[in-house]
């Protein structure tokens, strides 16, 4: 297996440096590419993600009902959310895929991207411990946990846009940061969103990349309604 050329960049994006880099390599390996693939790590990561998010929601919402907690957890750990996280990390650029999956665009396939996120979580856990993994996940989910509320619709603009495109079997939206201004503690992000059905790109500007992406996605949804 060839080494992944941009692995240090991916580690910086993830916010975690692996002691055993082979664990990350395995987490990025689809079963179509090698016998030592990421499915067992995915199984582990799925369980860890569930307990970390469950614990965070339990303490964040002391008055929420079991039903509300379950719905919020489902929103945060479902495949659509994991796919969006994978896109934010640009995981498709790092995946090991077999020739067939590569040719068919597996690096964009939602299930493969979501599974890779769970596998990376499992890899981080094996490389460190549960508390290190918890701290990393809470960092990944900080904005989503800050925004989510019990008893209301949990779907944000990026999720709604993704579901709309999936319904028509269209490619996922492409988000690119085209400009960052300001000091590290007071930055403004400009993000461009492109989809197959629109000839022009749509721009979102906000104080974080994710917020800018949400603004751009909301504008695309409005254009699609016209």
Swiss-Prot record:
Q: What is its main location?
A: cytoplasm
Keyword Membrane included in the entry's annotation: no
- The superkingdom listed in its UniProt entry is Bacteria
Q: Per UniProt, where does Mg(2+) bind?
A: 42, 115, 118
Catalytic residues per the record? 46, 118
- The reply to whether Mitochondrion figures as a keyword in the UniProt entry is no
Enzyme Commission number(s) from the entry: 3.1.26.3
Domain (RNase III): residue spans on this chain: 7-129
Q: Which UniProt keywords apply?
A: Cytoplasm, Endonuclease, Hydrolase, Magnesium, Metal-binding, mRNA processing, Nuclease, RNA-binding, rRNA processing, rRNA-binding, tRNA processing
Cofactor(s) it depends on: Mg(2+)
A GO term (biological process) for this protein?
A: mRNA processing
| Gene3D superfamilies, A to Z | 3.30.160.20, Ribonuclease III domain (1.10.1520.10)
An annotated GO cellular component of this protein is:
cytoplasm
Q: Give the location in the cell.
A: Cytoplasm
Q: Name one GO molecular function term.
A: rRNA binding
| Residues of the DRBM domain | 156-226
> Entry's InterPro entries?
dsRBD_dom (IPR014720), RNase_III (IPR011907), RNase_III_dom (IPR000999), RNase_III_sf (IPR036389)
Top EC category: hydrolase
Query: Which CDD domains does the entry link to?
Result: DSRM_RNAse_III_family (cd10845), RIBOc (cd00593)
A Pfam family it matches: dsrm
What task does this protein carry out?
Digests double-stranded RNA. Involved in the processing of primary rRNA transcript to yield the immediate precursors to the large and small rRNAs (23S and 16S). Processes some mRNAs, and tRNAs when they are encoded in the rRNA operon. Processes pre-crRNA and tracrRNA of type II CRISPR loci if present in the organism.
Q: How does it assemble?
A: Homodimer.
Q: What is this protein called?
A: Ribonuclease 3
């Amino acid at each position: 297996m060839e080494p992944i050329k941009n692995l240090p960049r991916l580690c910086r994006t993830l916010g975690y440096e692996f002691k055993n880099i082979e664990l990350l390599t395995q987490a990025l390996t689809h079963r179509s590419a090698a016998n030592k693939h990421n499915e067992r790590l995915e199984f582990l990561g799925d369980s860890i993600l569930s307990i970390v998010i469950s614990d965070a929601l339990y303490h964040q919402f002391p008055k929420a009902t079991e039903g509300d907690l379950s719905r919020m957890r489902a929103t945060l750990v479902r495949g659509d959310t994991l796919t969006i996280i994978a896109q934010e990390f640009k995981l498709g650029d790092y995946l090991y895929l077999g020739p067939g999956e590569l040719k068919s665009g597996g690096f964009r396939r939602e299930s493969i991207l979501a599974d890779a996120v769970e596998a990376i979580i499992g890899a981080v856990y094996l490389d460190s411990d549960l508390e290190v993994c918890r701290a990393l996940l809470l960092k990944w989910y900080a904005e989503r946990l800050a925004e989510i509320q019990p008893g209301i619709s949990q779907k944000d603009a990026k999720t709604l846009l993704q579901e709309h495109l999936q319904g028509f079997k269209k490619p996922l939206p492409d988000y690119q940061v085209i400009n960052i201004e300001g000091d590290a503690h007071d930055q403004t992000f400009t993000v461009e969103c492109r989809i197959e059905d629109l000839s022009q790109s749509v721009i979102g500007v906000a104080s974080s990349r994710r917020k800018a992406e949400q603004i751009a996605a909301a504008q695309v949804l409005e254009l699609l309604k016209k």
